[in-house]
Amino acid sequence: MEKYELLKDIGSGNFGVARLMRNRETKELVAMKYIPRGLKIDENVAREIINHRSLRHPNIIRFKEVVLTPTHLAIVMEYAAGGELFDRICSAGRFSEDESRYFFQQLICGVSYCHFMQICHRDLKLENTLLDGSPAPRLKICDFGYSKSSLLHSKPKSTVGTPAYIAPEVLSRREYDGKMADVWSCGVTLYVMLVGAYPFEDPDDPKNFRKTIGRIVSIQYKIPEYVHISQDCRQLLSRIFVANPAKRITIREIRNHPWFMKNLPRELTEAAQAKYYKKDNSARTFSDQTVDEIMKIVQEAKTPPPSSTPVAGFGWTEEEEQEDGKNPDDDEGDRDEEEGEEGDSEDEYTKQVKQAHASCDLQKS
């Protein structure tokens, strides 16, 4: 860890803490996500790292390496100085149609590349889209903790993601197409940018997950009268918010949609993007670590630290997190563990989903 020096903490969540670090030699700023050694280092962590490592696209946060400390596994990534798109929305209230399109175009290009690489993200949302520090911000998709590769993993069937962004078929507990669920989440992201609110939440009762679920499965949303957007934009949203994923617009169709094509930056055109889609297995990733090297480090990280004594600069121990009022197992109630191999813990949202199933409130497809 002599390679990096600590600058400041930049976030915390279910995984632990994230810190802004600087490479002592190159002076490059990086973000480091610290995960406590031991039980938290599971198949999901390995999946996140391996999936993320395989991706090389300007609209995806670059994975650099993993580092083992005495107390934590640290994932080293590109630092996005512009912060979360969520914070930008909170500051602005909502975006104009043109600004919303600018970010949506980048989001779709990043997701399209993920899908080409046979990886579905499964937790796309404003909080998982970062911005670089440039005057015309470049959007960067991050957090592949729920991602699945169709080449490496089974077809998803568990209810994961964030309630406001979740697609109807994900609630069914049956197998579903993760790529089409990503399309739905992209639509929710677009709606929030345009309106400044979530499409399927009751504004008077936003924490009522049961009501949100009901609105999702019945496609109950509307665009407020005070939001003036084009007919093309409305039509695109209506093609995304379709309950049957087989009838939902695809990423390919979105990229050819008139609203999406308008004012499309040159670097996002299909001709410019083609270089990222070359099937060249010898192409370098952003990481110098091989998969075998990474898996060896991850395996070693499964061994808990010998003691809970904090080590300066190596992240917080769980005791420190709890003293600061941060329960490492809490992440604002927006995460649900994978069933079976990924745990049996339930949050309030999961309970609401199960209650809805039990009372036949969910429409089975």
UniProtKB/Swiss-Prot annotation:
It holds the Pfam family Pkinase. Residues 317-347 have a biased composition (Acidic residues). InterPro entries: Kinase-like_dom_sf, Prot_kinase_dom, Protein_kinase_ATP_BS, Ser/Thr_kinase_AS. ATP binds at I10, G11, S12, G13, N14, F15, G16, V17, A18, K33. It is an enzyme of class 2 (transferase). Keywords: Abscisic acid signaling pathway, ATP-binding, Kinase, Nucleotide-binding, Phosphoprotein, Serine/threonine-protein kinase, Transferase. Expressed in leaf blades and leaf sheaths. Expressed in shoots and roots of young seedlings. One of its GO terms (biological process) is protein phosphorylation. CDD domains: STKc_SnRK2. It comes from the Eukaryota. It catalyses: L-seryl-[protein] + ATP = O-phospho-L-seryl-[protein] + ADP + H(+); L-threonyl-[protein] + ATP = O-phospho-L-threonyl-[protein] + ADP + H(+). Its EC number is 2.7.11.1. SUPFAM superfamilies: Protein kinase-like (PK-like). Induction: Weakly induced by hyperosmotic stress in leaf blades, leaf sheaths and roots. Weakly induced by abscisic acid (ABA) in leaf blades and roots. The active site is at D123. May play a role in signal transduction of hyperosmotic response. Can phosphorylate ABI5 in vitro. Can phosphorylate BZIP46 in vitro. Interacts with BZIP46. Belongs to the protein kinase superfamily. Ser/Thr protein kinase family. This is Serine/threonine-protein kinase SAPK6.
